[in-house]
């Protein structure tokens, strides 16, 4: 659990450093398969809220869930998550 939290925090910090306004940016891509295999967006939102995040917006981008939020530390982030596993997805630098 602690390792997952540390990895998640590192991803969030990296996302914060590389994020600026984006839509269909290609910053992240997910081999997510058919939408019938995707987990509900609400499940991701609930998991993030349980971590203390304040969700501003969630949308689809590059086959991933793209989340705009404020973390439990008050940091604004743009983060990507795989829609089947809900795992954080690394992003490409612009």
Positions of predicted regions on the chain:
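Classic N-terminal secretory signal peptides
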Residues: 1-24
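Sequence contexts marking disulfide-bonded cysteines in secreted/extracellular proteins
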Residues: 29-31, 63-65
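Short, non-transmembrane alpha-helical segments in secretory-pathway proteins
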Residues: 31-54
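Extracytoplasmic
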Residues: 50-53, 62-64, 74-76
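Short beta-strand
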Residues: 57-59
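Conserved histidines in hydrophobic membrane contexts and catalytic metal-binding motifs
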Residues: 67-70, 81, 86
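Residue-level signal for well-ordered, solvent-exposed loop/turn and beta-edge residues enriched
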Residues: 75, 86-87
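A short, surface-exposed interaction/processing loop segment used at functional sites
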Residues: 87-94
